[in-house]
Amino acid sequence: MALETFVNSEPFTFGVELEIQIVNTHNYDLTKAASDLMRLIKDAKFPGNITPEITESMIELSTGICRTHDQALGELHAIRDTLVNAADQLNVGLCGGGTHAFQQWSERQIFDAPRFQYISELYGYLAKQFTVFGQHVHIGCPDADSALFLLHSMSRFIPHFIALSASSPYVQNVDTGFHSARLNSVFAFPLSGRAPFVLTWSGFEEYFTKMVNTGVVNSMKDFYWDIRPKPGYGTIEVRVMDTPLSVDRAAAIACYIQTLARYLLIDRPLKLSEDDYLVYTFNRFEACRFGLEGTCVNPQTGERRTIAEDILDTLDRIAPHAAALGSRAALDEIGALAKARVNDASWLRTIFKQEKSLNETVRQQCLRWRE
């Protein structure tokens, strides 16, 4: 199969995708209701889209093409409200969070769609264990080579996105010690991690053709990279974030990525090199394990600082671009998180410490999702 032609798109437009948990309102375990939710909302009017995901206990909402923070917020609130109204009719709850705190993966049911059934057959139990919930952000790129430049430039900031969105400290009744345990599930897939260091679209087409010829991949969907190009949309897709506990947080993170993209493509502050990836896995682990308190190492200078400090320094650098995009309010929220060194994983641990119950913690996640 040939690689799709890269469709040039309006630079720095963006779209947000959020995978959402569906829980019962008895003990707040995951429940099977995606098909019923899809039936209830099929005639509803809302921006963006709502689609099923790999198991019946999750559903995905996505915005349309956004240009500003206000637009993204408005669309996310409207789609969220549509889903919440449908969930109320079914007496089920919806919430964010990168993992469900105590669900048993073996109880999950694969959604009845050809691709999901194929993934289940190919990956076995990993497919059910993949009942984890992420935020993806698409960024519009003017051309294919710019997309690859942005992809590799943005990779330096992967720890920021992980630490800011982290909301998965609990897995199967256990505090994992991680801020984002979700990404450990993604890493189990053979084509996960980071994209190959290729800076021209012709070079990327050559790589893709070689991979297809091995029989390992059929399409771009088979790559579970942290950031991957989406040629049919004319975007790159940042895929490392946990689903935040609120749509407001999701919009703020998306606009941080949008503003950073404008800075990286217009100012071109980075000279890209394969050596940029020497500390990639280390920095990624630090963000997953320790959140905003984690250490990140600059691959070119060897300088070490906390992820929170690196975010605050980055916010200063990209401030002029925030003014141009109207994303100052979003970046103020990001700055407040970095200064306080708190994220949704911190919030979940605080609630559990108060309530001594993961069931109650998930119930409060559902309340937070409606705010």
From Swiss-Prot:
Keyword DNA-binding in record: no
EC number assigned by the record: 6.3.2.2
A GO biological-process term: modified amino acid biosynthetic process
GO molecular function (one): glutamate-cysteine ligase activity
Enzyme class: ligase
Matches recorded under Pfam families: GCS2
Domain of life according to the entry: Bacteria
Disulfide bonds: none
Reactions catalysed, as given in the entry: L-cysteine + L-glutamate + ATP = gamma-L-glutamyl-L-cysteine + ADP + phosphate + H(+)
Keywords: ATP-binding, Ligase, Nucleotide-binding
Family membership: Belongs to the glutamate--cysteine ligase type 2 family. YbdK subfamily.
Function description: ATP-dependent carboxylate-amine ligase which exhibits weak glutamate--cysteine ligase activity.
PANTHER family: GLUTAMATE--CYSTEINE LIGASE 2-RELATED
Protein name, entry field: Putative glutamate--cysteine ligase 2
Organism annotation: Burkholderia thailandensis (strain ATCC 700388 / DSM 13276 / CCUG 48851 / CIP 106301 / E264)
